[in-house]
Amino acid sequence: MTKSELIDRIVTHQGLLSSKDVELAIKTMLEQMSQCLATGDRIEIRGFGSFSLHYRAPRVGRNPKTGQSVSLEGKYVPHFKPGKELRDRVNEEEHVPH
């Protein structure tokens, strides 16, 4: 699902807010979450999951085209850990292959 599809679903489901209001709310929420992670803070949404940063240590990688070794610096990457309610709900639903 894309961001615009999410906006359309919310507008259709609740019917009280305009598409522009829902779009602004989602953009604001995502911006705040991004800023929070950028400062190293953790985000927890009960029943859904938590977002945090994980550190990836420096390592030697390979250029897939040339096979040449490349030194990669250490970096922080966003990590999502689903909550128990989300895991349970996903496992209850029937999955249709894409």
From Swiss-Prot:
CDD domains: IHF_B. It comes from the Bacteria. Keywords: DNA recombination, DNA-binding, Transcription, Transcription regulation, Translation regulation. Disulfide bonds: none annotated. InterPro entries: Hist_DNA-bd (IPR000119), Histone-like_DNA-bd_CS (IPR020816), IHF-like_DNA-bd_dom_sf (IPR010992), IHF_beta (IPR005685). Belongs to the bacterial histone-like protein family. This is Integration host factor subunit beta. It comes from Pseudomonas entomophila (strain L48). The gene is ihfB.
